[in-house]
Amino acid sequence: MTKAGTGNSFTRLALLASPTERAQEAAAAIGDCTDWVPLEQAEAAVVLGGDGFMLETMHRMIDAALQLPIYGLNLGTVGFLMNRYTKGCRVLERLAKARRIAVSPLRMEAVTQSGATQSFYAINEVSLLRETRQTAKIEITVNERVRIAELAGDGVLLATPVGSTAYNYSASGPILPLDSQMLALTPISPFRPRRWKGAILPDRSRVTFRVLDPKKRPVSAVADQKELRDIAEVRLQIERSRELTLLFDPGHALDDRIVAEQFAY
C-alpha cells in the first residue's frame, strides 16, 4: 500500500552503515550532518549500503518490533530498495520530501516431520526446496481450498513484491510493483503439472504447502536466509502488525526500474 510521503518531519535519526569500505566512508562523511541517535531512540533510519544490508536492517527492525521509516542510500550494486547516493548533508532535505511505501513481511509457520513448530518472517520470499535427488511433491492450498493437489519438481516459493525481483524472478515468476498488494506463487523447476506457471494472489491470501511423502522426499523451508529441514507443512500469510515503511525520493523512478528489470538481459 502506498502512503502519502511528503512533509516528513524527523528530529531523531539513526544512521546504519554496512561494513563495506565505501559505506563506512559515506557514514563518516555525513557523521556531522546531525546528532544521530541509536536505532531504538530514532524516529527514522538512514541506511547506507546495498539491498542485502537493507534486508538485514529490516529483519532487525521486525525482530525488535520497531516500525521506523527507513531511507536507504545505495552504496551496493543493484540498490532496488535504495535511493541514489549523493555526498553531503542534503540527505536531510531529501528525507523531508520522501514518499512512503508500506511493506509487510510474510509470516511462516513451519511444522517439521517430528511435529515441532517454528515461526519466521520473510521480507523477500519463503521457498520450499527438495533436500535430495528425489523430486519434491507438494500440495498447495490457498484460503483452505486445494489448488494444486500435487506439484512435482524442485519446489515452490511465495514472494512478496519486495522479493519478486529476487529468487522469484530467477524462477520465472512475475515482478510485482511494491505497492501492488499482491503475492507471487511460483513453482521451482516444475515437472508436473507441466502447464502451470504459478499464480498472482491478493496479499490477504492464506497459503499452505503440505509435503507429500516427506520421509522419502524430504523438503526444506527457507524464509529469506533462515532454513528449516525435514518439513511436513508450511502455513503462510502477510503479517501486517510488523509493517515497515520505506522512504523514496519523489523523483525516484521506481516504476521505471520495475519495468526495466523485466527487459534486462
Question: Where are the regions a protein language model picked out?
Answer:
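ATP/NTP phosphate-donor binding region
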Residues: 1-48, 54-63, 85-101, 111-120
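Catalytic core of DAGKc-family lipid kinases
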Residues: 18, 23-24, 76-155
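A residue-level signal for conserved active-site and pocket-lining positions in enzyme catalytic cores
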Residues: 46, 74, 126, 225
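Short glycine-rich anion-binding loops that position phosphate/pyrophosphate groups of nucleotides
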Residues: 50-53, 76-78, 162-165
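Short, conserved loop/helix-junction motifs that constitute active-site signature segments
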Residues: 63-66, 176-177, 199-201
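Proline-centered loop/turn at the N-terminus of a beta-strand
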Residues: 67-71
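ATP/nucleoside-binding phosphotransfer catalytic cores, i.e., glycine-rich phosphate-binding loops
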Residues: 120, 128-129, 133, 143-148, ...
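Gly/Ser/Thr-rich active-site loops/lids in small-molecule metabolic enzymes
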Residues: 150-153, 157-194
